[in-house]
């Protein structure tokens, strides 16, 4: 249980789990604003090292005395609802001392007060779309504050306290945290049942997006993807309640009878080995329509949709459309979103955070499009690690279908994260449903994963490590093993 005071004293803030992507970003912003920041985490990380260089006091391991790292006790303690158990010794000590304990989402809401909030929500694509919006707004000279779940490749950070009026952030629906915010622009990329361990039913999950739409401030906008049926329906319901709703998508893929106007229409999507050339017709309320073109260097139609959402959201937030489009051309991606890790022996290795069947399908389709555009017979090899027992049991058949888009696959055992193992449940429930004629390896031994991938791959292939857990480390191990007897090849930005 957490406390949510109307106004929180943010002069001295302690983070329990400060190394997480979401928590470390908010800690960065607080340090930049002059707050005394302390925290703890179970292990060292790059995020911890960076925060220490900025002046934060951080302990490795959780203990009650960590509340005294900076001398005086903190004025507030911040925790992540999903990752930190409520009997954590620091949380217990804080409550005994009468120190307010709040969630990360409560802190983000406090930090966004007084800003024009641009919130990106949806089952998939939040991090990529948020990152694109930030890149576009930066190019437009607006210097937005931002908090992202991943690290921008070009900026090298996941958060920033800007001088501009806009604050761009992800709106996480997994525990209804998105209902803490008051967006001027609220984007819904798509809606597909997920996090049912929290919501219980698909209907309850859908409802949280309806409630999010109702959080849009007076004069603000809800932006929805009209290619996604549930997002479009949510937009239509919101419009009936008097909310200003605008849509985006390719005209040929949108219901022409939709009550939501198509404000960012994708007119052209020309795919090449270098990425895609995009042409969009932007029709903002009260303005003459204009056509804009940009080149997108991250593959996949899902990324094209994300870029259209970012363009529309950025324009509604006050950015010049032509400058926003230039910012999308400059966008080089986000860590762990089809991230290029390197190449050895002609085998290119990419890493992606996808952990839902729809996301796995999207990233494998993007890899397939890249391979086909090169026209050199490249194959796609997937190394997948399921995330959560509950999600694996619910979507085993869908994961099998998604992985079948690859030419071959290595499937690691389940990364349980916050969940306890379920007796009799392994990743075999996925591999047993995959095509019999497809080369598939079920690998319960994590240390063997890199070798398994290498046994399947050949020069010219694209290898993808996929998942929200420790599979990201396999990408580096693959490159190390491939290059062990060769001179290491310097990783360089590929033509994606």
UniProtKB/Swiss-Prot annotation:
GO cellular component, as recorded: cytoplasm
GO biological process: cell division; cell wall organization; peptidoglycan biosynthetic process; regulation of cell shape
Entry keyword Repressor: no
Taxonomic superkingdom: Bacteria
Chain residues that bind ATP: 122-128
InterPro entries for this protein: Mur-like_cat_sf (IPR036565), Mur_ligase_C (IPR004101), Mur_ligase_C_dom_sf (IPR036615), Mur_ligase_cen (IPR013221), Mur_ligase_N (IPR000713), MurCDEF_pg_biosynth (IPR050061), UDP-N-AcMur_Ala_ligase_MurC (IPR005758)
Predominant location category: cytoplasm
Pathway membership, UniProt: Cell wall biogenesis; peptidoglycan biosynthesis
Leader peptide range in chain numbering: none
SUPFAM superfamilies named among the record's database cross-references: MurCD N-terminal domain, MurD-like peptide ligases, catalytic domain, MurD-like peptide ligases, peptide-binding domain
Subcellular location: Cytoplasm
Pfam family, one: Mur_ligase_C
Entry keyword set: ATP-binding, Cell cycle, Cell division, Cell shape, Cell wall biogenesis/degradation, Cytoplasm, Ligase, Nucleotide-binding, Peptidoglycan synthesis
EC number: 6.3.2.8
GO molecular function: ATP binding; UDP-N-acetylmuramate-L-alanine ligase activity
UniProt catalytic activity: UDP-N-acetyl-alpha-D-muramate + L-alanine + ATP = UDP-N-acetyl-alpha-D-muramoyl-L-alanine + ADP + phosphate + H(+)
Function: Cell wall formation.
Family affiliation: Belongs to the MurCDEF family.
Protein name: UDP-N-acetylmuramate--L-alanine ligase
Organism the protein comes from: Corynebacterium aurimucosum (strain ATCC 700975 / DSM 44827 / CIP 107346 / CN-1)
Lineage: Bacteria, Bacillati, Actinomycetota, Actinomycetes, Mycobacteriales
Gene, per the UniProt record: murC
């Amino acid at each position: 249980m957490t406390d949510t005071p109307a106004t929180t004293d943010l002069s001295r803030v302690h983070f329990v789990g400060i190394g997480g992507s979401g928590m470390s970003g908010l800690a960065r912003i607080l340090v930049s604003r002059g707050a005394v920041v302390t925290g703890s985490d179970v292990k060292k990380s790059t995020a911890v090292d960076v925060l220490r260089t900025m002046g934060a006091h951080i302990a490795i391991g959780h203990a009650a005395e960590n509340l005294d790292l900076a001398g005086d006790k903190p004025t507030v303690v911040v925790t992540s609802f999903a990752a930190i158990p409520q009997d954590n010794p620091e949380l217990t000590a804080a409550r005994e001392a009468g120190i307010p304990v709040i969630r990360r989402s409560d802190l983000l809401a406090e930090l966004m007060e007084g800003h024009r909030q641009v919130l990106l929500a949806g089952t998939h694509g939040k991090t990529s779309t948020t990152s694109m919006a930030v890149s576009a707004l930066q190019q437009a000279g607006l210097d937005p504050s931002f908090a992202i779940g991943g690290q921008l490749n070009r900026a090298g950070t996941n958060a920033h306290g800007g001088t501009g009026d806009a604050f761009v952030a992800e709106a996480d629906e997994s525990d209804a945290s998105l209902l803490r915010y008051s967006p001027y622009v609220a984007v819904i990329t798509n809606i597909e049942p997920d996090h049912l361990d929290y919501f219980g039913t698909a209907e309850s999950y859908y409802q949280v997006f309806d409630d999010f739409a109702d959080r849009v401030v007076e004069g603000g906008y809800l932006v929805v993807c009209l290619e996604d049926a549930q997002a479009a329906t949510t937009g239509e319901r919101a419009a009936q309640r008097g909310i200003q709703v605008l849509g985006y998508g390719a005209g040929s893929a949108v219901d022409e009878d939709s009550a939501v106007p198509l404000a960012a229409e994708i007119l052209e999507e020309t795919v090449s080995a270098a990425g895609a050339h995009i042409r969009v017709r932007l029709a903002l309320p009260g303005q003459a329509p204009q056509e804009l073109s940009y080149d997108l260097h991250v593959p996949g139609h899902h990324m094209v949709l994300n870029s259209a959402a970012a363009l529309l959201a950025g324009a509604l937030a006050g950015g010049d459309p032509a400058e926003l489009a230039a910012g999308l051309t400059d966008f080089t991606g986000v860590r762990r979103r089809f991230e290029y890790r390197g190449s050895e022996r002609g085998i290119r290795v990419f890493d992606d955070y996808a952990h839902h069947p729809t996301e796995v399908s999207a990233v494998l389709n993007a890899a397939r499009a890249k391979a086909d555009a090169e026209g050199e017979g490249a194959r796609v090899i997937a190394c997948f690690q399921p995330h959560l027992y509950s999600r694996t049991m619910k979507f085993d058949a869908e994961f099998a279908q998604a992985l079948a888009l690859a030419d071959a696959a290595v499937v690691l055992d389940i990364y349980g994260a916050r969940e306890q193992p379920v007796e009799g449940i392994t990743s075999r429930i996925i591999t047993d449903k995959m095509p019999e004629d497809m080369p598939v390896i079920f690998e319960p031994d994590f240390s063997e994963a890199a070798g398994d991938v290498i046994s399947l791959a050949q020069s010219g292939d694209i290898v993808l490590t996929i998942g929200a857990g420790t599979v990201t480390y396999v990408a580096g191990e693959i490159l190390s093993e491939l290059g062990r007897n060769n001179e290491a090849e310097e990783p360089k930005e590929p033509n994606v």
